[in-house]
Regions:
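A conserved structural motif in NAD(P)-dependent oxidoreductases
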Residues: 45-50, 60-71, 82
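Short C-terminal tail/terminal secondary-structure segment
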Residues: 64, 75-77, 82, 87-100
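Conserved SDR Rossmann-fold cofactor-binding beta-strand/turn motif
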Residues: 19-29, 79, 92-94
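A short hydrophobic alpha-helix cap/turn motif
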Residues: 11-16, 28, 66, 79
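A glycine/serine/threonine-rich, flexible loop-to-helix segment
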Residues: 27-59
Length: 100
């Protein structure tokens, strides 16, 4: 987090045409998450993957997990000219998870 802010300041102050922002995704429906949920089931924390997924989704005010496409669209935005005056920012894309 602070590394990206320091890099953003350094690039801006040196006049480099480089913007540095950080993307902070929440839980995303990916094979990696499915693997983690399966491990939780195997350890006895949940009876099945569906229950584990629903429980994790319920921790988000939006009551669901992100899709990879949603995170990708956020990354495309911060890399685009639409965010040309954005540097040193933290874009939180977590369905409200950290807002609660």
């Amino acid at each position: 987090r602070l590394l990206s802010k320091a890099a953003a300041l350094e690039c801006a102050q040196c006049g480099y045409p480089i913007r540095v922002n950080s993307l902070h995704p929440g839980y995303v429906q990916t094979p990696m998450l499915e693997h983690g949920l399966a491990r939780m089931v195997a350890s006895g924390r949940f009876p099945d993957v569906q229950t584990a997924s629903a429980t994790i989704a319920g921790l988000h005010p939006m009551n669901r997990l992100a899709t990879p496409e949603e995170i990708a669209r956020s990354a495309v935005f911060v890399a685009s000219d639409d965010a040309s005056f954005m540097t040193g920012a933290e874009l939180v894309v977590d369905g409200g998870y950290t807002a609660r």
